[in-house]
């Protein structure tokens, strides 16, 4: 399975021996409490894979159609995300929310919508490409994209060429996010929209900055002050609560977390030459 969430590939369920070995290694590395959470999350996934058909349906993935009693649990040294990853397509809460929001967004625009998708995830590509007039992609390291080797903070993308720019959990990986947001704005037509999701706690005022990107490639964990950054480059900054899209048919849940937020950045502002 690809390490990139949303790769439209089933997640591999680990065996009990592998879980025990992983847990021991983390504990010996000094992360004792995190090791316990890892063992619990992976063991719960192991049990779900074997007993899930006996349990009542509670969730449905809008990206691939999976239905089951729960999504899988994802753990790292910082936290555990319960009921997070689809076992069939590896979508996360943000992918599932965007897969429901973006089609409606595109339908509201003119029929010839040109979309640029940074660091494209297969689960979202399957949703967007069929309904976009033009669907292009960019990435710094990924092969098979329209614009390979593209660093948004040193953008070489064509200016004023796209109607919608999707940037899903990308900015936190870029050291100079101010330059990256400027790059988003330059790429859009005057009435264009950037759809941005980022990790953070938006009840917290300030963004937490890290000394390096050793935590999953992240340079920061955003706070509400990101709105000030967006407002430097866009006329309108809209906050969308994706959790409002959580209800699936039959009383099921799409597994879209409370607080799952997307930002719609409308109308790029002119930038100095």
Spans of features found by a protein language model:
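Short linker/helix segments within small regulatory modules
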Residues: 72-83
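Conserved alpha-helix/loop element of class I SAM-dependent methyltransferases that forms part
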Residues: 85, 91-112
